[in-house]
Amino acid sequence: MDISTDNPDHGFQFPGTFELSAMGAAERGLETELPRLLAATGVELLQESVSWKHSSSGKYVSVKIGFRAESREQFDAAHQALRDHPEVKWTL
């Protein structure tokens, strides 16, 4: 199947700045581990864009990470690294 658009300005543009979020158990240290994991994929981590928030019960943490990717392949590798982490319940 060929997917195309009538407006080439829609969709991801590379190189570009992006943000991914991941949620998992709060006691697993994901706040520090996930940014390191993304950096290891070769994307440029934007330290000022790394943030996290604990759930109201304190059981879970949502980690938001900003980064710069030079290509779709880099973006996909970064997203896959988060999805592959055994403590990550979901990504966005």
UniProtKB/Swiss-Prot annotation:
Gene3D superfamilies noted in UniProt: 3.30.70.260
SUPFAM superfamilies recorded: YbeD/HP0495-like (SSF117991)
Could you name the domain of life of the organism this protein comes from?
A: Bacteria
InterPro entries reported in the protein's UniProt record:
UPF0250_YbeD-like, YbeD-like_sf
- Similarity comment: Belongs to the UPF0250 family.
UniProt-listed NCBIfam families: PRK00907.1
Q: What is this protein called?
A: UPF0250 protein XOO4915
